[in-house]
């Protein structure tokens, strides 16, 4: 059965969250571990693929094959300075196949596999989709997915591709701070007054500032700014560097940076210390046998942490100044400053923002981890025709974060759509040829705020040919930019004299996936899903055999039962059970069918003996005390008896 609505997904750098409109309100959905946010981690092992909590929990044991931060790669080029800098902090391998698109290399089931950032992100989206399906009890086909407001065209398009690969129809890509503003607006209710609201959204990997006016149900974005590469991960990096040096100083120059496992354990401890410092003034890190069998203990206070990250914290104020400037608004006119994103819990960040607004009390009424998914779920409800008094008349007027234009003579950036223009929008402009009898024009589309295109970001190029011979400046070429509600651009050019026309959806060939690649990845995703299902079935069959064998063993250990069995039967049962457990121990990677066959073999020996004993006691069909029901042995194994099955690892 298919869910006729749509879900809202906040696809985060470090954590993701999913919500749905149910019972006239948004429900934020907990995952299979009971957590309302899911780590944006994907891990590959010799036998399976893990996503979310399961992936993050084993990262110290398997650092090279556990992928995170895909959002910091998506829509970027391999040679991007930001990517090159991040690679120093990642234990997994990022390479390129020569087309400047980054790919991630991992070992999966004994083979080397490469995945694009879109593919990894699609796996996280799939996990969120499955989380929603488990809650709704229906298949989910549609979603609204959020992106940082300052994401460029190729990053937005790549995120949309990730949704397609995961099997979702992405109804809309919306900006994270705008989604959070919806959550704030619904939470506050309509008091009939127009309010100027600044959303300060500092998450795990990205930072956005959006200034908007809320009047009744109309949310009108005035300006947006930010940094697509600033967040909690960067604060963690500073702590990791600090403690790596501390370890070196305390241990005669031992460099733990040479061990990915040690670095990962340290990073986990640093993330925990960072969180502690939001509520306490001091945090202690204790890690046994961190590197070269040396234990590590160190303390850091809040003041030192603030000093280590001071420049990063201070850099969050500049985008705030810029949005006020772009919106031509005085900071005293801002009614509410709303904090969103986990990193806004840091006291220093809060005090910097409050001081900038003259000591203003900051609004912390919405959950900083869930607000974005909440807003996305509201938008998903509206886009699928949902009706509710709360969402009646709700209208989102968002803006494009960056100026869009084309290159004209001399490498000049000629703007067609200025930054902070409300979307959707369409703008046209007439251009002409640069030389006499020019047969065609090469149109290059750029995004950015600089005067020259060499300092802006190239989105894509196309040609318009077949222009009749004419002196320079005579042909009239109309270039039209059509920016949709997702912030994705379509460009067309038409020669007015002949009506010759050409157009492209900006696909940024250098950073974007082709239709064929997306289709191939959709098919791959189905295959991986089938693999995951097969692995789950295999584990269930293995557990079924293990549970049955141990339950029989426990039953034989019960004096009520063993006293009523003759020695031959008892010996047969013991021998068969021990043989089955020994087989299990040596065949951890057997197939589902082999486990089921082994269980059937064991049942064929055990059941007749137990039935015979039971009948000799005159028992009916109802079972007896001390003898378990063997009809559905696939749950958790009863206590008693060691096992070579799954072990619980302590997470560093």
Swiss-Prot record:
GO function terms (MF aspect): ATP binding; ATP-dependent protein folding chaperone
Low complexity bias (residue ranges): 626-646
Region annotated Disordered, chain positions: 619-652
UniProt entry tagged with the keyword ATP-binding: yes
Record's keyword terms, sorted: ATP-binding, Nucleotide-binding, Stress response
Family named by the database record: Belongs to the heat shock protein 70 family.
Protein name per UniProt: Heat shock 70 kDa protein
Taxonomic lineage: Eukaryota, Discoba, Euglenozoa, Kinetoplastea, Metakinetoplastina
Gene name tied to this protein: HSP70
